[in-house]
């Protein structure tokens, strides 16, 4: 007879009658989605984790990662003690001695204090997927170092920059597809775990309502597996497809003319006088002394009825979108939309077929389908609103065609212009911030570009002084660049220089290489938080590991001092001079702030917190607390009172009492402000704010009035509300930039047409002139331009699996059972042509390196592409795993064939493998060949490295490993 009891009873059946059962709410951090969770404890131990049904983001849904968070606590990779490298030991040998936190703080305070007193840029702080950039950026600014960035530069900065410089918002935290009302979704280059639970919920509802889902991706896994249509595409050719779609929509007359005229710069007249320093700029009837961060309404249309130029948005005007005209002084002009039409004429579906591999007829059909739905199936909601020109509207009209895209589109050296093309495609269909289209999430939309600016020269970095500007910003023209008098970079990673002018997230992937090369200057101390830069978060991993341990002729490390803060032993911690043990997300206070990357919904701002459900293990300390402590010891202005005394007791006290300016009422958290918690978004500090968040599911959700929820780029009510609550500086319209005058300003500088302003160094002028095109264009990824495509005929990709987040989870005993090691997925036709068997050993090789791995046949990948999971392969002994674990013996890391730099140019200059506009790392540009491994070769993945030793404080006992599998079970006597 079958046993009827459940397969798994988390609380067990034989409970001690005195057992203390409690449930606590907090926010997950098993990926960047940040769902609400409920953690059940028995006698202080975690028993199981559930989704919180009262949380607006995931509504109770939880994924495999989230439910396995309990394993974080029992991982044998947990770091529990501050560690100092033993004298005489080499980096990478993991030879450490335990020290106290007081010793660790003394070491940091002494070293960083000397740096700040002499040359603050000698300290560099780079952080991974930490979700606390408001704090880390504040620390860097007050320290006075420009050398700060988070992981965005090697993740998806092209997505952020390409969209924000075009529509004032972007996908992911700041916007997304309105699948509640959309009828057609086109998803491009999105990993199968992206925005995990909320996107799964939305897709499920969308499909049940009859929506059509089309996936454009070289690989059909994850979300693509449930798509109604999979359109396989060659990696790095997305821009060609998007430009061909724009061409076809214009050819078929399916663009939304009224929307473009009213809400974009499509009808604005562009100066075409090649001899003018204003060539390519919009014609203005007056020039205000400072345009600030918004588009002043001082440009011109050519009116159809009057047949002459008039001010934009003149009541009753009907401007041309097409045509060529001359001003009274003879200046030739065209509407920006005409320039777009001229540009895309060459980008036909037939042309795109030869580049993308997508049949021309498919491209035509896709364009027709999205254009017809956007035009003929509009949605009208009875929501009255007023635009910024004073026009009152009785309803909101939507075009129910939506898009979603992420890193697969962004992580190419041509990604910025591809994403500009995507943004323009969305715009000409009339889908920006409308029902069924793309919708913003607070604090966006913001002006184009947003207002924060970096320093502009070396004089803005001074000893014992906060940075004069923000560490990261949004340049509007060449004068905003952070360069010296010769036009050379001031930042270590060369962000905001002529090499990468719009590197709005920095270039973390360049930090170690540049510090090792001492280019543009040597640094003293590099602090890496929560980033595995000696393994999966770096390109050409073996060389970077060598750089970290490299010494000069005097026997001194080329990177003199390296601090690593992390919760787990990793490939990176072994190289540290000082290791700081961080807590897990279940052991600390944390906030997803409106000042950073909140979890807002379409209907209004949402922020959230983490509340500790467990005490820290061993001597772990939250990195936030470390920054508060060091900032206080160094007497950084934001962390001390005027008399130099400590201002904040700890991190929770800092979050409660910090204001962006004295009396501003704007802090890290928007909920329950005011002395009694009666105010929202803006108000005095509330001493019980954390307590109120804890009582309210650790989340604050402010629902905007219905009249503020759409058309926010031009919604007067919303913009005034956003200005009042410091989410935008101006309550001015944020028109869509079909034509980017910002890019044209950089191009003019490269052409010598920036009188009295900055010009790029000679070696970079052609580069700037080429890539800073005000209209999107297609070019091959830079690596493809430099590769022998006959020798390396294939593209290679990595993506995150649904059950693991980068390198975080191979030490997670439950998730290991889903992904223990990875294969290289190859189309059977491609593999068989190379005589490679399914499950057989093979080599994958690029001009940068080669890897031996296992092959897995897959029909779900286009024949010209091979791919694998990211970061499943581990170095032997890392992450508390057995040295012979499958992760290191069979698993592999594709990064070994990806270069962080391209071959030097004729002048011997090093060129980063990055987008020339933003510095986005070109992860998916690598070209490879594959071939069968010799049958006599040992059956092990290559390359291999020396076995990494466990670090002091790690519990790698058999008991610990047993707990790692059976955590959550009932206690045994």
Where are these regions (language model features)?
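N-terminal export/assembly segments and adjacent metallocofactor-ligating motifs
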Residues: 1-316, 524, 529-531, 630, ...
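Flexible loop/turn segments at secondary-structure boundaries
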Residues: 34-37, 47, 56, 131-135, ...
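N-terminal leader/propeptide and maturation segments of large enzyme subunits in energy/redox metabolism
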Residues: 85-103, 254-365, 464-493, 610-760, ...
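Glycine-rich phosphate/diphosphate-binding loops that line cofactor/substrate pockets in enzymes
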Residues: 105-121, 175-183, 343, 366-383, ...
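A glycine-rich phosphate-binding loop feature that marks nucleotide/adenosyl-phosphate handling sites
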Residues: 129, 262-265, 369-370, 386-389, ...
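Extended redox/cofactor-interaction regions of prokaryotic respiratory oxidoreductases
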Residues: 136-214, 240, 318, 323, ...
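Glycine/threonine-rich phosphate-binding loop and adjacent beta-strand/alpha-helix elements that clamp
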Residues: 176, 586-616, 626, 903-905
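Long, contiguous, secondary-structure-rich segments that constitute the structural scaffold
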Residues: 610-613, 617, 621-683, 807-825, ...
